[in-house]
Structures are given as structure tokens and as C-alpha cells.
Amino acid sequence: MAITKDDILEAVANMSVMEVVELVEAMEEKFGVSAAAVAVAGPAGDAGAAGEEQTEFDVVLTGAGDNKVAAIKAVRGATGLGLKEAKSAVESAPFTLKEGVSKEEAETLANELKEAGIEVEVK
């Protein structure tokens, strides 16, 4: 019996974040591709939409800085990730630590991580 797309989607839905990251890395190696997002230009026009303030932000770890151990500890403390997940996140930068958080929460997390010497972006 052949595996269907639904079977694959169900298997991925039951994976942890780290398992999905490992799956993506394995697929990149197997097929010689990159899973990096392609930048797409937004629709032209509507000047009113450009004035709207962003309400949800992503906190992205862009670099571990000089002290990798301190970076892993800071990521664990700030996100609640386990040791293995935090280590993988630090080593695979850029890595999105939090998605869809408020501006205040994103800035607080970013400042906490920057104090530990980690390079962080709020998008």
C-alpha cells in the first residue's frame, strides 16, 4: 500500500518541533534543496494598509554570540525548551524562538537574550 499525502501530514502533525527540524534538514540533504523562504513582493497600491501597525511579532535568534553555553542557557530559560532543543536552536541560527507574540513580549524576550550576548531580531 502506498503512503498518501494525508498519511505524511498526519505523521508530521504528531512530531515535535525538533523532529520536524531534523526532517527538514534530512530532506534538504536528500534532495539538494533549501527550505529558506522566498521573498515575495506584496501587492502594489493600498496606501491605507501601509499605515497599519503590526500587532504580532516573531523573535528570531540570528547568532549565538561568543559564549555558546550561555546562549543555550538563556534560550532554555526564556523559551522553556529542553536542553537538546535549545542547543539545536542555537546551533541552527537563524531560528524562530517565538512566533505571533505581542510587541512588549517580543521586546522583553529580545532584551533578555541580548543581555546574554545572543544576536536577536524582532520581526
Curated annotation (Swiss-Prot):
Keywords: Ribonucleoprotein, Ribosomal protein. Pfam families: Ribosomal_L12, Ribosomal_L12_N. One of its GO terms (biological process) is translation. GO terms for molecular function: mRNA binding; structural constituent of ribosome. InterPro entries: Ribosomal_bL12, Ribosomal_bL12_C, Ribosomal_bL12_C/ClpS-like, Ribosomal_bL12_oligo, Ribosomal_bL12_oligo_N_sf. CDD domains: Ribosomal_L7_L12 (cd00387). HAMAP family: Ribosomal_bL12. NCBIfam families: L12 (TIGR00855). Homodimer. Part of the ribosomal stalk of the 50S ribosomal subunit. Forms a multimeric L10(L12)X complex, where L10 forms an elongated spine to which 2 to 4 L12 dimers bind in a sequential fashion. Binds GTP-bound translation factors. Forms part of the ribosomal stalk which helps the ribosome interact with GTP-bound translation factors. Is thus essential for accurate translation. This is Large ribosomal subunit protein bL12. The gene is rplL.
